[in-house]
Amino acid sequence: MKFYHAIISFLAVFLAACNSNPLQPHSGGRLFEALVVGDTNNIVGKALDTDMIALPQSEPCFDVSSVSHKAFNNTLQLSRNIVVVNLNHTRYHGVKITYEKDVYAHPQIVVSINAPSVTSLSQALNGHQGQLLRQLLERSELNFTISQLRNKRNTRQEAAIKKAFGIILQVPVDMTSSRQGRNFLWLSNNSATAMQNLVIYKLKGKPLQQAGKNMTDTFTSLRDSVMKSNIKGETNAMYMQTVALPVNVNMIHERNKKLIIFRGLWEVKGDAMGGPFVSHVIEHKGNTLVVEAFVFAPGKKKRNYLRQLEAALYTLKQQ
């Protein structure tokens, strides 16, 4: 597992560092949409439209469209995320996944999957290579979202974060509402239909490092304590808390530092509000810093709203 995380961390740097060719046309497509070329029996499509974890309703990791090699014309070549499947039992002796950047347009990633047979392709994508494919496309799309954020930032809120916590974080331009507490800052676009929120808070010491196998329970308890004090409903008896479902945890290395990622669902005690959250946890100057995104969008799909904010979390830099 560490091997795959290392690959994805490397790809994040590589994809962000490559310069686009200004002579190429601009790519298109909705966020987290992928075009699959030459898919047989929808094998790649099934690997990509696996449910994204920790959402309140079923939503796929990617919205997938599929075309044949013959139908892959000049217009479709402008898609931002392309997966090309090549099956040939004499030419390929195993399943291999490779990628190129900005082949037909920019920004763009074109992933090639070469396999000797439908059976070998299916077996590979049901295992680690399916996970690798999703992570590769997810990180490429997050990098695209980060590039969009760079030109539409709220520098006033970024300055407030830097002053309060000593970190650099890119903040979406529409995050105009804020509330500050003790070692706590809440930013929001305050939308009535799709409210996107960023929360930054500091925990004294390194409680997760000491928690061992109980790290998820420890984080949930600490998170609930912070949210109960800082994010309340109409009365003091109403406050944000973590939904009592398994919270997903993942550890990776980002910029040579350990990053712990928690995903789960939140709700307001005593109210009908809730949605997904994702928290990035790092050690910072002897303490623990949590940078979290959460979404409230009743009646709407949540994936892209959360992914947009998750891209912002990856811009965090320590001073």
Feature roles, as predicted:
Residues 67-120, 227-288, 300-302:
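Signature of long, low-cysteine stretches enriched in small and polar/charged residues
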